[in-house]
Amino acid sequence: IRDAARTSIGSVMPAKSLELKHTIKLIQELTSEINEIEDAIRKIMDELKPPILSIPGMGFYSAAMILAEVGDFSNFNSPDKVLAYAGCSPSTYQSGKLTNCYAHMEKRGSRYLRYALYTATKYVCYWNPVFTEYLTKKQAEGKHYNVALSHATKKLVRLIYALQKSGKAYLAIT
């Protein structure tokens, strides 16, 4: 009876129970595919040994997303170009000799990179005292949390750029 109860579904309609069995099987297949892909990402990251993983609070998958989206950092002349690629640079308006800078982010770049940087910044600000202090300083200046976090994101991009260009691990300044 117990075996029958484990394999059966509490539904009178056979179509619903068949649909549920197929849905469960599909979820199990997708879960195994996700695990396989995550293992492949982990192997690639173990081979690369990127210096950005030495930043306290930098997550494994955030680092993988950032590296996958940016690719080769030598394609960018400066961290500002990486910020612009992510869509985190301030929007500008130009007409003739007038150049005006607005306070809003452009959000024209890679939304995946922007998401990975934003998520990584939250954790780095929590685990890294240098970034925690920077975030607190920006909030003390009267900036909204999200604005302060965008400033911390810019600081993180500058750090990631420097680490990837130099190939050296992060050393905290105490």
What name fits each language-model region?
Residues 1-174:
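A detector of single, family-specific signature residues
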